[in-house]
Amino acid sequence: MSIAILLAAGKGTRMRSGLPKPIVPFMGKPIVAHIIESFKEAGIQDITLIIGHGAEEVKETIGSEVNYVYQNEQKGTAHAVKQVPETSALLNSNVFVFVGDSPLITADTIKKLESHHVKTNASCTFLTAQFPILLSYARVIRNDSGELIACIEEKNATLEQLKVRELLTSHFIFKGEDLFKNLDDIKPDKGNGELYLTDIIGIMLAKNLKVEAVQIDDYKELVGLNTPEDLQWSEAATRSRV
């Protein structure tokens, strides 16, 4: 059994819209609705949205097809996940944690991630892609044998690490028990005090828990939309698929 948590509490100031970011229209539907549809198409029916800014407006727009958890203060992606109650269903399931602003993600990619996670019996599996454009995402660091050794947020990366084009964009699946067991080990960022979920990768690797990365071909599936220009770019990418 798998459960999905979508991080949708952001305000989306750069969108320059009067709407909360998750419900900004994209190709005729709210951004987060595309992600919900992809999960349902992949057979994942138990979906929780973590909401914050404009929470009631988001609930009214998306409706009762998903569950809701409030993040009253936005203190990072790991902090958002910590707002979800640790139910036995969560602890005994595989738990997707996806950002709620990447509407090009497909059901096939979701199924591919889940299949690899189950097949390898990993504690954590996440999506990556080779990005031909420079974006401010975490770098996936591997050793000379190609083994995953770390994921480094862009602002903490060295000049050499910044050259890495394999990027991580916060599309995870976890064993539920391992996710919640390790969340409390994440320390606040020294710069802004936020709790980053990407830090759980290093924590798990240090404990010799199995962490897997699944690289997909189309990096555009992983791109988060933050500005009106991003919306235009993503709509053009969607039309080119048809």
Q: Can you describe what each PLM-predicted range is?
A:
Residues 1-17:
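N-terminal nucleotide-binding beta1-loop-alpha1 segment
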Residues 105-191, 200, 209, 214-216:
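Conserved core of the sugar-phosphate nucleotidyltransferase
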Residues 25, 104, 173, 224-225:
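Short aromatic/basic micro-patch
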Residues 2-6, 32, 46-49, 227:
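Hydrophobic targeting segments
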